[in-house]
């Protein structure tokens, strides 16, 4: 049946009559929904769409050849003039098949991550030209879209007409929009701005029948550790309002292919409902099972779920807490504990709380004995620490008198409510060990209870050696970004493998069950009692995400081993011993090249006598090749001198975990990354980050136009008359195709501006590089990793300002507040992308910095370069 304007007018009258009747029933939600639908009916866009539909069906498809004039006149007689709708329409810049947003503020949607650069994607200089604005015009709609117009449900900005047929459902306040999937590093994460309408209250939570939902074999823990819930969401203007990650092709946590909630968007449908949480695992969307599907299939299931979406989720049971007050008196080492967490710097995903991550031996907290690792700080004196930033929490703890009152929430169960919590030890230790270990081994005997955990009321630091059990203990660790978080030594002549160092904040440290001097007996059932160092390292490296370790505390054996190593070191340093005699033997000789992630000067670190200096020292040229210009993220000299007068309140910042320690001496030291030498046949792209990067980029291209160039970006906007495809832009006809290419990681960075996509493709960068020019890229730090994945290793140079005054001196147009913000952004940038920088430069003047950048690019141009490898140390 053809859709005619008189039918739309009649529907509008019926809706208005129904709205009038509703004013007496007191249902504000339904009245608001109907009011929004009425506004859509009154919009000029809807009028234009109905006009097009009627023209198409009545005029173009009329087999009786009725005069167009009659149809047109009838249309205008049966439909009121535009000005009676009392709506204003903004200018349209929409091309074919792109509808125009009506009466909605223009917002910006980004594909890129939250980098330091939040400006709109440039069109060489400015993509927005006021002269291009055009008056309202009739939108061209394809035949496919026209055939669907009878079910238009509404409209929001940045959307396409993508209507859904929903029987017996009142049209919603907003229309479907195409989901915008951000460019993401592995694992992929998708924001669920997935379209659809409907106005219906969400029912109460329903517990899913757990018998019908089989447990995923990849998820740690027993059924007793989890709870299940059905959550029904109604799509809002921004879709469902959450982000997901995971899938069989891109596991989010270890090898677990489940689909996890990674972000709840403030103000979205999920946030308003209040039941969905970060780290929830989606088992089913309506009737579609998404437990063992690819990431794209999960996204598709959410897109096609309709306007009312039922999510069946699984989550770990919440942790019960005990609130207590703790009084501390500051000592020489201050309060004596470290913290992590806060808004924007979550220690546990989805949790903004401030957590204690380390108790410093000899400090006030250690002597008091009540605070433990994993305790949550709720308040300090009269200052609330809930929902505050990490910096605010640090400031509150620093600005305290000698007597400090802390309000603390102590967990009453062993593991915290996070996705990395290990499974229950008693239930997971079955036949696994016995299947791999001889029955004669004492490993098959019942294990003694492990030492007190990080949540035990007994402080581990207060236990003496005599109080620690010497029997085999079972420890379950979950590998993190820093690996397992400990170092091993030993493996010579069957003397055993010992733990020599535990990384602060790493999985081993947070577990609290391992200590220096532990002998590793087995890893995942592999007997290491007689293993060489290489065999032990291989067993740990290949143990997977969940690692089960049997360890024994053997401090006496470890002390003897340390003494042996000390004697060997003294012999090597005090005599000219030839390579191989008197040194530790390894069963397999191997050369390993590493890059220092800090400012390294070998002449200051190692003392060589006159006989061995000529063999062991590195000349300047080779040192520059092996060790990149990377600097430790620490306080400068001035700030260090200022803090010495109040050393008990000195705060050091851990660059890897934003963990603040209330101590006076120790700093977190970055380690090494494994590298390999590679020959490149192209000119490496150049990415300069930090203050004054635009000036440096412009100067490089101006001074060396034959060595530096820029690539041609892509866009979905229509080509202007004076533009040339391939010179000004690569004009993409299909927005869907560009969105697909973005999802397929063919772009190093992309964004949206004025409803059009802009992006820099890997292929565009490669074309410039293969022509023998360094491609200058004005992109964020995330693009460095994406280029590396594409085998285009960029020269990434970070301009590190010395101070706020240094920035103001180089750019006199900046006000002091602007300079401070620029400095803070630079520090955050360094902290986030330090390991990806090729070099860091500093200088008092722009000219000095520019000369350093030119020298670095010349040195790093190849043809032989050092590139990071996936292999961990």
UniProtKB/Swiss-Prot annotation:
Domain L27: 4-64
SUPFAM superfamilies tied to this protein: L27 domain, P-loop containing nucleoside triphosphate hydrolases, PDZ domain-like
Keyword Cell membrane assigned: yes
Superkingdom of the source species: Eukaryota
Topology term for the membrane: Peripheral membrane protein
Disulfide bond entries: none
Keyword Transcription regulation: no
GO-annotated biological processes: actin filament organization; cell-cell adhesion; chemical synaptic transmission; cortical actin cytoskeleton organization; endothelial cell proliferation; epithelial structure maintenance; establishment or maintenance of epithelial cell apical/basal polarity; negative regulation of G1/S transition of mitotic cell cycle
Biased composition (Basic and acidic residues): 63-77
An example Gene Ontology molecular-function term: phosphatase binding
Keyword entries, A-Z: Cell junction, Cell membrane, Endoplasmic reticulum, Membrane, Repeat, SH3 domain
SMART domains, per the entry: GuKc, L27, MAGUK_N_PEST, PDZ
Compositional bias of kind Polar residues: 85-96, 441-456, 650-662
Chief localization: membrane
Family: Belongs to the MAGUK family.
Role, per record: Essential multidomain scaffolding protein required for normal development. Recruits channels, receptors and signaling molecules to discrete plasma membrane domains in polarized cells. Promotes epithelial cell layer barrier function via maintaining cell-cell adhesion. May play a role in adherens junction assembly, signal transduction and cell proliferation. May play a role in synapse assembly and function.
Identification of the protein by name: Disks large homolog 1
Gene of this entry: dlg1
């Amino acid at each position: 049946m053809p859709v005619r304007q008189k039918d739309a007018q009649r529907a509008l009258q019926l809706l208005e009559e129904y709205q009038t009747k509703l004013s007496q029933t007191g249902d504000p939600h339904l009245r608001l929904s109907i009011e929004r639908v009425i506004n859509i009916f009154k919009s000029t866009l809807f009028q234009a769409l109905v006009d097009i539909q009627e023209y198409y069906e009545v005029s173009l498809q009329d087999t009786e050849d009725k005069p167009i004039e009659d149809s047109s006149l009838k249309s205008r007689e049966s439909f009121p003039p535009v000005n009676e709708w009392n709506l204003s329409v903004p200018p349209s810049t929409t091309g074919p098949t792109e509808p125009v947003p009506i009466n909605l503020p223009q917002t910006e949607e980004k594909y890129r991550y939250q980098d330091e650069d939040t400006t709109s994607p440039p069109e060489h200089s400015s993509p927005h030209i006021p002269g291009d604005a055009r008056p309202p015009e009739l939108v061209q709609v394809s035949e496919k879209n026209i055939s669907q117009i009878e079910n238009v449900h509404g409209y929001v900005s940045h959307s396409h007409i993508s209507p859904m047929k929903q029987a017996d459902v009142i049209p919603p306040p907003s229309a479907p929009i195409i989901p915008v999937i951000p460019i993401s590093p592995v694992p992929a994460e998708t924001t669920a701005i997935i379209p659809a309408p409907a106005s219906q209250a969400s029912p109460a939570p329903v517990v899913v029948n757990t018998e019908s939902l089989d447990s995923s074999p990849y998820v740690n823990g027993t059924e007793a550790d989890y709870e299940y819930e059905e959550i029904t969401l109604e799509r809002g203007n921004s879709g469902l309002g959450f982000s997901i990650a995971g899938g069989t092709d891109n596991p989010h946590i270890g090898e677990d292919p489940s689909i996890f909630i990674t972000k709840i968007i403030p103000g979205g449908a999920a946030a308003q409902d209040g039941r969905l949480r970060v780290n929830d695992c989606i088992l089913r969307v309506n009737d579609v099972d998404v437990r063992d599907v690819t990431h794209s299939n999960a996204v598709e299931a959410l897109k096609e779920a309709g306007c009312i979406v039922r999510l069946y989720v699984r989550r770990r049971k919440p942790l019960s807490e005990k609130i207590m007050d703790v009084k501390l008196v500051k000592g020489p080492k201050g309060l004596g504990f470290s913290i992590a967490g806060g808004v924007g710097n979550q220690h546990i995903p989805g949790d903004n709380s401030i957590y204690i991550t380390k108790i410093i031996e000899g400090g006030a907290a250690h002597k008091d004995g009540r605070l433990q690792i994993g305790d949550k700080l709720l308040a300090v004196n009269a200052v609330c620490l809930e929902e505050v930033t990490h910096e605010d929490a640090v400031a509150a703890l620093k600005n305290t008198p000698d007597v400090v009152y802390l309000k603390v929430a102590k967990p009453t169960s062993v593991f915290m409510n996070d996705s990395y919590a290990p499974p229950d030890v008693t239930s997971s230790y079955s036949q696994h060990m016995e299947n791999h270990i001889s029955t004669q081994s004492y490993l098959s005997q019942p294990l003694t209870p492990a030492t007190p955990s990080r949540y035990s009321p007994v402080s581990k630091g207060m236990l003496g050696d005599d109080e620690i059990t010497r029997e085999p203990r079972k420890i379950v660790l979950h590998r993190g970004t820093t690996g397992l978080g400990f170092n091993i030594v030993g493996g010579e002549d069957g003397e055993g493998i010992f733990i020599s160092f535990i990384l602060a904040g790493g999985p081993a440290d947070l577990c609290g069950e391992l200590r220096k001097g532990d002998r590793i007996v087995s890893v995942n059932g592999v007997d290491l009692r007689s293993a060489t160092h290489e065999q032990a390292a291989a067993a740990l490296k290949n143990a997977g995400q969940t690692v089960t370790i049997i360890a024994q505390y053997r401090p006496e054996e470890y002390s003897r081993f340390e003494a042996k190593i000390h004697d060997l070191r003294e012999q090597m340093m005090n005599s000219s011993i030839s390579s191989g005699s008197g040194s530790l033997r390894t069963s397999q000789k191997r050369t390993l090249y590493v890059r220092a992630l800090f400012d390294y000067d070998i002449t200051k670190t190692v003392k060589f006598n006159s006989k061995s200096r000529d063999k062991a020292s590195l000349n300047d040229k080779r040192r520059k090749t092996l060790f990149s210009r990377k600097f430790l993220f620490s306080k400068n000299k001035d700030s260090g001198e200022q803090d010495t007068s109040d050393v008990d309140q000195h705060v050091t910042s851990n660059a890897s975990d934003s963990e603040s320690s209330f101590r006076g001496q120790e700093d977190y030291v970055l380690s090494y990354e494994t590298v390999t030498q590679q020959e490149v046949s192209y000119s490496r792209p150049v990415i300069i980050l930090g203050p004054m990067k635009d000036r440096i980029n412009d100067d490089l291209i101006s001074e060396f136009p034959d060595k530096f160039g820029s690539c041609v970006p892509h866009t979905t906007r229509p080509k202007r008359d004076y533009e040339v495809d391939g010179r000004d832009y690569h004009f993409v006809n299909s927005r869907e195709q560009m969105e697909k290419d973005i999802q397929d990681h063919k772009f190093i960075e992309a964004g949206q501006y004025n409803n059009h996509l802009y992006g820099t493709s890997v292929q565009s960068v490669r074309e410039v590089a293969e022509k023998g020019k360094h491609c200058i890229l004005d992109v964020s730090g995330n693009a460095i990793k994406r280029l590396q994945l594409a085998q285009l290793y960029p020269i990434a140079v970070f301009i590190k300002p010395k101070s706020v005054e240094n920035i103001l001196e180089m750019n006199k147009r900046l006000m002091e507040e602007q300079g401070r913000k620029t400095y803070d952004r630079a520090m955050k940038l360094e902290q986030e992308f330090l390991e990806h920088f090729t070099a860091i430069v500093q200088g008092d003047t722009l000219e000095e910095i520019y000369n350093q950048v030119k020298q670095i690019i010349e040195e790093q141009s190849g043809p032989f370069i050092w590139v990071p490898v996936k292999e961990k140390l």
